[in-house]
Amino acid sequence: MNCIEITSLEDQGLEVYGTLTEAQLRNKLEPEKGIFIAESPKVIHVALNAGYEPLALLCERKHIKGDAASLIERCGDIPIYTGERELLTSLTGYTLTRGVLCAMRRPMPKPVEEVCRNAHRIAVIDGVVD
């Protein structure tokens, strides 16, 4: 387990949880570097089951052996940033849902031809983000 105790909001690796905007996380210029944040153990498990790659976890210390234990086991040797609830709330700007967030690699967009290949109906929705 690669636990990293957060001592400062300036610690390297934390920017994905607090200072980067959605546009920066999405990384339109280099989509292979795109990241999204999964919130709560349930959502993170669903993303892992769907094959998404975890990059780092942000977890309240008390959840490492609790709600996050099975996630930590599934995620392998990724950084697990941990600290007290108040510090993590200061970092993210809100109280973590069930005490866990996971930075995950955003999938590359599929070509239109692949998406439409076996479709019977296609809905085109403009202006929707995430």
Language-model features: locations:
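RNA substrate-binding interface of SAM-dependent RNA methyltransferases
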Residues: 4, 42, 49, 80, ...
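A secondary-structure boundary/capping signal
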Residues: 39, 60, 83-84, 105
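Generic structural "secondary-structure junction" signal
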Residues: 39, 90-96, 106, 130
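Structural motif
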Residues: 35, 55-57, 79-81, 99-102, ...
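A glycine-rich helix N-cap at a beta->alpha junction
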Residues: 72-93
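Boundary-proximal intrinsically disordered activation/regulatory segments immediately upstream
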Residues: 1-67
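A short acidic, glycine/proline-enriched capping/turn motif at secondary-structure boundaries
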Residues: 63-65, 86-89, 97, 107-110
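Solvent-exposed alpha-helices and their adjacent loops that cap or buttress functional pockets
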Residues: 28-30, 73, 93-95, 114-118
